[in-house]
């Protein structure tokens, strides 16, 4: 999963307006190829948590479950979009991540909402943001990790974009 964070950082560097991004682009593409080669388990149609390992516990939220949606969270260009949708649907059904169950791991994992944003899952993303607002914004319960707040902000931005697209699509269909 850390490899996806590195990939995303390099991707963002490419977009940052630097003059020469050729070396960055080459490194990012190599990492992308290695992520696909090492972590995609084609036989079992899932992402591995450790390269070339059959370790997998479908009832474990972290790392096993989260690994299935981590490529979505970091906007990794997954080749098999239908397979990724199946993994996302299984993750959502199995773990109900939008409820922000802190008891599960001691951590909110608000970042899972980015997977919903990538899948266009407005309902679950709205539920996540609503649960976050209800549980953590009223009294600013400690600890409010800045990382969690940051993910919520990014997810709200994505949600805004999803609503914009939905409105534009609706108007086009009505015209």
Map each language-model feature to its residues.
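Extended ligand-binding clefts on enzyme/binding-domain cores
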Residues: 1-8, 12, 16-109, 117
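CBM-like carbohydrate-recognition segments
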Residues: 39, 60, 72-175
